């Protein structure tokens, strides 16, 4: 498995989940787990994905998701699981 953690944060608007999930599906990136909340009008989502069978590489995914986030007014960050874990270890 090639796990990648994707986080999405920003002002809540219609279609955020749809746009992110459409990108992932079109590029054969599997969603393993997802958590999403809205707090005082701010959207927060974390996804654990598997890029094992993806049709794009990790670097392209990072660039594409960054551009997608800019287009819909949110910040989207993709990190390999081992980097995410080392940055968020308590």
Placement of each model-derived feature along the sequence:
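A conserved regulatory-domain signal marking ACT and ACT-like small-molecule sensing domains
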Residues: 1-90
């Amino acid at each position: 498995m090639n796990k990648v953690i994707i986080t999405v944060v920003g002002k809540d608007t219609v279609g955020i989940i749809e746009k992110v999930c459409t990108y992932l599906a079109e590029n054969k990136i599997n969603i393993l787990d997802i958590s999403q909340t809205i707090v005082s009008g701010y959207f927060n989502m974390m996804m654990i994905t598997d890029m094992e069978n993806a049709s794009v590489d990790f670097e392209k995914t990072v660039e594409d998701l960054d551009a997608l986030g800019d287009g819909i007014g949110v910040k989207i960050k993709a990190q390999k699981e081992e980097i995410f874990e080392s940055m968020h270890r308590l």
